[in-house]
């Protein structure tokens, strides 16, 4: 009778680096300069990151660069359709490794993209934010919203203490 309260019917399984994970994903769009999370979208764990581009892109993003990893290679057209410039690291394939020039280009692209990866590192390491211990999509969305809010507060304090010139008031 009360089985539904003990079983999460919204969560799904996924495999990441050979490890199985059950639950939800927190997809984010963040500012490269400040590392503040601007927008987020919660999905079950089985949804691939590349399928959640459109919900994160806004009208104000048109004309800007969007840094993506190699998993988004097939979604380049969607990013262009949204009016953004996709910056995607190239990927080597079997019997067709990357050239030295491609490796150099990837290094340049990765310098900007890694700033966003720092967010996930902080959320997972310092905040234990990769775990959502609730049942249901609605509660997972709320948990991710709070995690992202707390991260932004931490980040705002860091910016205010060490780089106050990045904080601008828009009146």
Question: Residue ranges of each PLM-predicted region?
Answer:
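Hydrophobic/aromatic-lined pockets within catalytic cores
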Residues: 124, 154, 158
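Short loop/turn segments at secondary-structure transitions that flank enzyme active sites
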Residues: 34, 92-94, 155
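Polybasic low-complexity intrinsically disordered regions
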Residues: 1-70, 75-80
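A short, flexible helix-boundary coil/loop motif
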Residues: 130, 158-171
């Amino acid at each position: 009778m009360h089985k539904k309260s003990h079983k999460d019917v919204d969560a799904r399984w996924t495999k990441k680096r050979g490890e199985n994970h059950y639950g939800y994903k927190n997809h984010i769009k963040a500012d490269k300069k400040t590392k503040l999370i601007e927008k987020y979208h919660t999905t079950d764990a089985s949804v691939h990151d590349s399928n959640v581009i459109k919900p994160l892109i806004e009208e104000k993003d048109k004309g800007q660069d969007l840094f993506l990893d190699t998993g988004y290679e097939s979604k380049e057209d969607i990013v262009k359709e949204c009016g953004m410039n996709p910056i995607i690291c190239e990927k080597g394939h079997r019997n067709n490794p990357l050239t030295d020039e491609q490796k150099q280009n990837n290094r340049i692209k990765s310098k900007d993209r890694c700033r966003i990866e720092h967010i996930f590192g902080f959320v997972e390491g310092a905040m234990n934010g990769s775990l959502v211990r609730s049942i249901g999509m609605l509660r997972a969305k709320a948990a991710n919203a709070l995690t992202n809010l707390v991260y932004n507060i931490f980040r705002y304090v860091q910016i205010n203490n060490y780089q106050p010139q990045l904080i601008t008031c828009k009146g």
